[in-house]
């Protein structure tokens, strides 16, 4: 492609030269169009490839091929799987599927707690060499002390905590935000406080521990305000 705008991250010149030298162009076709931009591969830090356990929804093969088609060369997979990657043994099942089925780079998250049940910390130390971070995605960690200990261990291991924030006692069977749509059409709503209260708690723990933290989902203006003020 010629005349396109090239968007690039910083790259060591020696690496760039090596890549250029390795490209064979015996029958090169030139596509000339200044309307387009050329980017390096994208990375999606929150995907669900659903293997092991839920291959009827997605697989490493289908998920990675769809990612590559869309320009994503690296993704980070969430741990709400069966079995949950909460131990070296369970994580290895996922790593084997990644090795056999993925056409892109896949970096899994390990679970924060065993079975994502919020009762016992998972084997963070054992999984650390092969995960990008720790998350109980799909469920909020309800115990303040459990989340504090998770942050401290993650900090010692150099791995980020990635949180799905919900206070279970405030869900009350809801499955959609308790806003105008829910009130007009009848779905049972979830109050904004369910999300915001746990984000506020976690941000206080972040201040106490000084560690890296990411919220998976932000769905209310109240949550945005809490984060903005932190």
Language-model regions, residue ranges each:
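Active-site mouth loops of central-metabolism enzymes
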Residues: 45-58, 79-81, 107-119, 185-193
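Histidine-rich, glycine-flanked metal-binding segment
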Residues: 1-41
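Short, acidic/polar
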Residues: 56-64, 115-126, 201-202
């Amino acid at each position: 492609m010629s005349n396109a705008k090239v968007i690039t991250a910083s790259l060591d010149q020696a690496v760039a030269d090596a890549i250029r030298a390795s490209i064979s162009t015996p029958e090169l076709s030139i596509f000339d169009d200044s309307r387009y931009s050329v980017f390096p591969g994208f990375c999606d830090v929150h995907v669900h490839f659903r293997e092991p356990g839920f291959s009827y929804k997605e697989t490493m093969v289908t998920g990675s091929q769809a990612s590559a088609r869309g320009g994503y060369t690296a993704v980070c997979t969430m741990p709400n799987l069966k079995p949950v990657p909460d131990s070296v043994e369970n994580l290895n099942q996922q790593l084997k599927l990644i090795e056999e089925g993925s056409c892109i780079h896949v970096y899994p998250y390990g679970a924060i707690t065993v079975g994502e049940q919020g009762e016992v910390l998972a084997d963070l130390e054992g999984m650390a060499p092969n995960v990008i971070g720790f998350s109980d995605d799909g469920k909020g960690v309800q115990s303040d002390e459990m989340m504090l200990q998770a942050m401290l261990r993650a900090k010692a291991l150099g791995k980020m905590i990635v949180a799905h924030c919900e206070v279970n006692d405030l869900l009350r069977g809801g499955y959609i935000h308790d806003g105008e749509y829910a009130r007009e059409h009848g779905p049972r709503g979830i109050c904004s406080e369910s999300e915001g209260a746990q984000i506020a708690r976690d941000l206080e723990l972040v201040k106490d521990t000084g560690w890296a933290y990411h919220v998976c989902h932000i769905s209310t203006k109240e949550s945005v305000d809490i984060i903005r003020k932190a």
